[in-house]
Amino acid sequence: MLNNLYRHWLSSYIGIPKSIWFLTAINLVNRCGSMVIAFITIYLTQQLHFDIREAGYVMVFFGAGALVGAYAGGRMTDRLGYYPVQFWSLVLNGIMLLILMLVHQFWTMCAAIFALSLISEIFRPANSVAIARFSTPETRTRSISLYRMSVNLGWTVAPVFGGLLASLGWDWLFWVDGLTCIFAALLLRGLMSPKAAAPSTTDTDRKAALAETVSPYRDRTFLWFIFLTMLNAVVFMQLMWTVPVFWKEGFQWTEARIGLVAALNGFLVFLVEMPMIHRLDGKRHQLQYVRFGLVLYAVAYLAFELPIGQALSAVLFIVAISFGEMFVMPFSSNYVFGRSAGVRQGQYMGLYTMAYSVANILAPLFGTQIIAAWGYAALWYMLIGLAGITWIGFWILGNNNPDGVRVQTPPERTADAIPQAG
């Protein structure tokens, strides 16, 4: 039995294009270096002696920068191509991190954090377009899952190394993070050919193609999908913003115990998502899986109100929210990939990224204000209700647009048509 499970787990990785593995490796290096953001609030309050309100305002600028960066990244990707946008985003992000350690004043820090977030977020739409271009329809969802594995693994590693570096001195954190970004850019240059990724259309052809394809900002079905995606992200992101505070204040847990339980999320996603996606992909509509994931989100928050004890409720929460994430995120990304193509693909990816950027601003505000006014129990029930409303929205969307496809323009390159460097 274990041998069969192992073979199925291994088979889920077979057939994924080599370029997707390269992109995953580049993203893993980049994510492993995402140490400054993991510790930025502590750095602002402990090292720069900002009060908690000032630190909160700085993070609002971070969210605003991410929103602008996602929009700009989508536009730039369609105009310049995904390769230069990724490369220069990584390089400039590394330089910006080195500059950031020289900033100590509040308003200067707000501007620097805005710029850092903007530059960093420009990378995401370009990276998503690259994954879409290199993967085939048969491997697309698994390619997304493989990419997400690198994100989860990187976010697991980054806080560990970040904590060690911060204990040696905060400058170490900025230097290593900045140089890691630049190294990821060099890795991109070494593994993948910039010539192969260049746009294949002339300006005249591009203008003609733009006239023939639908802008995502006029695609009402897609805008409805983006709104629902933002709502489900607000539900999910309480995992990062309010649940750890609840474990600290409500359960009186130590940071070590909170970190250990939270790490179970990344471990489950790393272990289970790829083989699960391999078994499920193509058997049902993507939005059916997304709706099931939302049911699991609701179960996760309900766990805190069940009379089953602290440890069991926390484990049930993590298991449910992790499996919910595995159903929601890969299949919603695949829905976007299937709906977008050609000269506007970057804009579609940028708008999808913006949904999470907006949620990243709204989620902590929504969660903390509900807690302050009515307490944690009220928040859990409101999140369950929000998950239910979002489920209904996706049900309506799926019934009105069962195929999920609007734009039929073929991509500029196929997975097999793009050679690697060297």
Describe the role of every protein-language-model region:
Residues G69-G81, V272-H285:
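Helix-to-loop junctions at the C-terminal end of transmembrane segments
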Residues F114-V151:
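Cytoplasmic helix-loop-helix junction between adjacent transmembrane helices
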Residues M1-P17, S193-F227, D416-G422:
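Juxtamembrane intracellular "pre-TM" segments in multi-pass secondary transporters
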